[in-house]
Swiss-Prot record:
Name under which the protein is recorded: Large ribosomal subunit protein uL29
Family designation: Belongs to the universal ribosomal protein uL29 family.
UniProt entry tagged with the keyword Cell division: no
Any GO CC annotation of this UniProt entry: cytosolic large ribosomal subunit
Keyword Endoplasmic reticulum in record: no
Species: Desulforapulum autotrophicum (strain ATCC 43914 / DSM 3382 / VKM B-1955 / HRM2) (Desulfobacterium autotrophicum)
Assigned keywords, A-Z: Ribonucleoprotein, Ribosomal protein
Highest taxon in the source lineage: Bacteria
GO molecular function, a single term: structural constituent of ribosome
Length: 65
């Protein structure tokens, strides 16, 4: 997910996507701990997407463009 795509989203869409990614990350971490996750490279990718969403959300709160 690109930062430009995130900036085009509304605050509600960002919050919804953030919740969705956090749930997915939790499930993937659990699978990784149990040893069922085959593609472990997806974990850092999701973590970075969560960080991007949180950054844009914070920018919106501070009215930074």
């Amino acid at each position: 997910m690109k930062i430009s795509e995130i900036r085009e989203m509304s605050a509600q869409e960002i919050t919804g996507k953030l919740t969705e990614l956090k749930k997915e990350f939790f499930n993937l971490r659990f699978q990784h701990g149990v040893g069922q996750l085959e593609n472990t490279a997806i974990l850092p990718s999701i973590r970075k997407d969560i960080a991007r969403l949180m950054t844009v959300c914070r920018e919106m709160n501070l009215n930074i463009s």
